[in-house]
Swiss-Prot record:
SMART domains in the cross-refs: Aldolase_II
Metal-binding keyword on record: yes
Molecular-function GO terms, alphabetical: methylthioribulose 1-phosphate dehydratase activity; zinc ion binding
Its job: Catalyzes the dehydration of methylthioribulose-1-phosphate (MTRu-1-P) into 2,3-diketo-5-methylthiopentyl-1-phosphate (DK-MTP-1-P).
Top EC class of this enzyme: lyase
Protein name: Methylthioribulose-1-phosphate dehydratase
Organism of derivation: Exiguobacterium sibiricum (strain DSM 17290 / CCUG 55495 / CIP 109462 / JCM 13490 / 255-15)
Catalytic activity, reaction form: 5-(methylsulfanyl)-D-ribulose 1-phosphate = 5-methylsulfanyl-2,3-dioxopentyl phosphate + H2O
GO cellular component, one term: cytoplasm
């Protein structure tokens, strides 16, 4: 695909997530691979209101997260997370959002270091079709130092698709294509919301 196609794919995801209010306080960042050798990708520019569309919404960076040539804006503060994804896998897209549900889930299960899901139909959206399929999402500490956070995050990048929760921060999901990454992020957010609502209902009943 061309650079422009990748740009439009990422812009469409940004618009859709903005409509869902998944970018509170300018949080969150999105990235899509534009080249594999050498690794290059588009990533959301830092500090911008992602509910607005401007010509400078994304910047083009190299395998270390540095700007390629002169550009307006600078890469998102968490670009190093996407650097780890694109350098360690052939994934084509990496998405990071802060939602209330993923933050609450990460705090509730943070001491366990993971959350597990099974017996949910939407797990199939994650590519798991077995009758007893189980999905495990690791939960890591929210290090203020981004290189430290990225190093901890990188320990859980083992496949071309995956997800990691950062405690009281957000989730990063990556997959081979933008479509797959968006689909999987939607599935995880569904599972988080379902889990929280189910727990609340059980407490109300019992």
């Amino acid at each position: 695909m061309t650079f422009l196609t990748r740009y439009e794919e990422l812009r469409a995801i940004k618009q859709e997530f903005a409509a869902r209010d998944w970018f509170p306080g300018t949080s969150g960042n999105l990235a899509i691979r534009t080249n594999s050798s050498p690794t290059e990708f588009l990533v959301t520019a830092s500090g911008k209101d992602k509910r607005q569309d401007t010509p400078d919404d994304f910047v083009h960076v190299d395998a270390t997260g540095q700007l390629i040539g002169e550009q307006n804006g600078r890469p998102s503060a968490e670009t190093l997370l996407h650097v780890e994804v694109f350098n360690r896998t052939t994934a084509g897209c990496s998405l990071h959002v802060h939602t209330v549900d993923n933050n609450v889930i990460s705090e509730l299960y943070g001491d366990r270091g993971e959350i597990r899901f099974r017996s949910q139909e939407i797990i199939k959206a994650l590519g798991r079709w077995e009758e007893d399929a189980e999905v495990i999402v690791p939960i890591i500490t929210n290090h203020a130092d981004i290189p430290t956070l990225a190093a901890d995050f990188a320990k859980h990048i083992r496949t071309e698709s995956g997800a990691v929760l950062i405690r009281n921060h957000g989730i990063t999901v990556w997959a081979p294509t933008a479509f797959e990454a968006k689909k999987q992020l939607e599935a995880f957010e569904f599972l988080f919301s379902y889990t929280l609502k189910l727990q609340a209902c059980r407490q109300a009943i019992y």
